[in-house]
Amino acid sequence: MRVLKFGGTSLANPERFSQAAQLIEKAHLEEQAAGVLSAPAKITNHLVALSEKAALNQPTDTHFNEAIEIFYNIINGLHAENNKFDLAGTKALIDAEFTQIKGLLEEIRQAGKVEDKVKATIDCRGEKLSIAMMKAWFEARGYSVHIVDPVKQLLAQGGYLESSVDIDESTKRVDAKSIGKDKVVLMAGFTAC
C-alpha cells in the first residue's frame, strides 16, 4: 500500500484540500493507497491554545470561533466545487465535535488544569475532522472509503501525548490485503480518540 502524508499547509483551505484529495485519488487509481491527514493549518495551534487557556480560566472564544471558521471555509469551498459534497452532514459533524470541545473546556475550567487524556482528545479533533471532510469529498465523487480505526488497528505504547506505534503489529492489524482495492483508505496523522 502506498502512503501519502499531508501536513496542515496542504489542507489549509478549500483549494489545497482539493489538491490533496486529487493526489490521493490519482494514487488510488494507480495502486492501493492511503492518505494520512493532519489538521488544516492553524487548527492544532487553536486547539492547543483552547485547553491551555481554559486551564488558566482565560477567554477561549477567539480560538474556538477561528477554528470553526477554518473548517466552515473548507467545506463551503468543497461544496462550491462539487454540489454533491454533503455540506449539511459535514457541518453537523463539525458542530458536534466543537460542542464536545466546549464541554471539555468547561470541565478544564472547573478543574483548573487539563489532564493529558483530555488534552489529547481536544488536540486530535483537527485530524478527525480532516478525515471526515476528505471522506465526504470522496463519497461525493462516488468512492467508497475505508477509515483506519486507530483504536482497533494501531498498537501504540506510551502516554496520551507522547506515544509510538508498533509498526509490525499495526501493519498486521491494518491488513491492507483485506481492504478492498476499490476503497480509498484514510487515516489520521495524530489521534488519541
Where are these regions (language model features)?
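Nucleotide/pyrophosphate-binding catalytic subdomain
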Residues: 1-193
